[in-house]
Amino acid sequence: MPQRHPQPAHPADGIYFGLMSGTSMDGVDGVAVRFETGHAPVVLAEAFVGFAQSLRDALFALQQPGDNEIDRESLAANALVTRYAVCCHELQRTAGLSRDEIRAIGVHGQTVRHRPERGYTRQLNNPALLAELTQVDVIADFRSRDVAAGGHGAPLAPAFHATVFGAPGETRVVCNLGGISNITILPAEGGDVRGFDCGPANALLDEWATRHLGKPYDDGGKFAARGTVHAPLLDALLDEPYFAAPPPKSTGRDLFNPAWLDAKLAAFAQVAPQDVQATLTALTAVSVAREVATHASGCKALFVCGGGARNPVLLDALKQALHEAGVPASVDTTAALGVPPQQVEALAFAWLAYRFTARQPGNLATVTGAAGNRVLGALYPR
């Protein structure tokens, strides 16, 4: 009787789960994917499991220093991992897999502090509990080794982007519009891949929508579409030194948080809420376009992934900003390359788990600024 799955060509080949909960903190995206040496990854299932508002509140509160942090962090990590386990069980059910068919779960965790300049990054997680709940090997803590090697620990997705999205003869940019925007530059002639965080994206857009719509996000960018970009406010937002800093660089809610936004808005109390939303949309678009113009002026095609790919108003703003910056690039989502935009980040962490299992580096030192490429992650056996 033929085997359901052929013997792998490489000992690390097989089926992996990838889990990613980003800076928007609305839930966890998961994928089940088969990696085989010499072949493109094959997605077997995808799932999204949302977070209760109580968990979101706990995670947001941990973004800034506060009382009783160790206890609050530990309890939030356990609650977070129970949602991760639900996502894994859904992937397993949808793909029709037994536990023994899953090589490992690659899980990012939830970033609550990212301070590489001080030598650390903290992703909230309890991988031991996840291994217990799923009875599958878990690979986690992907960022700390890069930071230990002098890097920013972010972004890590560019190595995966280069593997899946690169094309000889065409300079491409992959732009992730999650809570924070970041870009990966894939040179046409096989030069060094580069990548870095550009600035805020959904983190501030969602925050403003929650305040003024009572909803977790601006559905389809409709709130922003009702407004007009306020040029003086946009200039004030872009005055943040991070935007002018050279790569390698990374950022997060440590900088671009509600307190930062409120401080910038203090001198613009007269600006209508919908105009603020339109201006925050422009901030995301302009900050990305300026970086592309500076570091990838020959880009012919830009592909968007992340939650922002579902915001047509943001995509239109990005197209306009690229045009104004003199970048003649087409703009599409990664779906045009065969990978739905909501899958890309989770796929990257499944791939990092695959790389760990093969004992192959997962970072790119040219991206993160680390002393060299390193094997990333730590194993929690089932």
Curated annotation (Swiss-Prot):
EC number per UniProt: 2.7.1.170
Chain residues that bind ATP: G22, T23, S24, M25, D26, G27, V28, D29
Reaction(s) catalysed by this chain's protein: 1,6-anhydro-N-acetyl-beta-muramate + ATP + H2O = N-acetyl-D-muramate 6-phosphate + ADP + H(+)
Stored InterPro entries: Anhydro_N_Ac-Mur_kinase, ATPase_NBD
Pathway: Amino-sugar metabolism; 1,6-anhydro-N-acetylmuramate degradation; Cell wall biogenesis; peptidoglycan recycling
Major enzyme class: transferase
GO BP, sorted A to Z: 1,6-anhydro-N-acetyl-beta-muramic acid catabolic process; amino sugar metabolic process; peptidoglycan turnover
GO molecular function: ATP binding; kinase activity; phosphotransferase activity, alcohol group as acceptor
Membrane spanning residue stretches: none
Pfam families per UniProt: AnmK (PF03702)
Keywords attached to this entry: ATP-binding, Carbohydrate metabolism, Kinase, Nucleotide-binding, Transferase
Domain of life assignment: Bacteria
NCBIfam families reported in the protein's UniProt record: PRK09585.1-3 (NF007139), PRK09585.1-4 (NF007140)
Family per record: Belongs to the anhydro-N-acetylmuramic acid kinase family.
Entry function: Catalyzes the specific phosphorylation of 1,6-anhydro-N-acetylmuramic acid (anhMurNAc) with the simultaneous cleavage of the 1,6-anhydro ring, generating MurNAc-6-P. Is required for the utilization of anhMurNAc either imported from the medium or derived from its own cell wall murein, and thus plays a role in cell wall recycling.
PANTHER family attached to this UniProt entry: ANHYDRO-N-ACETYLMURAMIC ACID KINASE
Designated name of the protein: Anhydro-N-acetylmuramic acid kinase
Species assigned in the record: Burkholderia ambifaria (strain MC40-6)
Chain's gene name: anmK
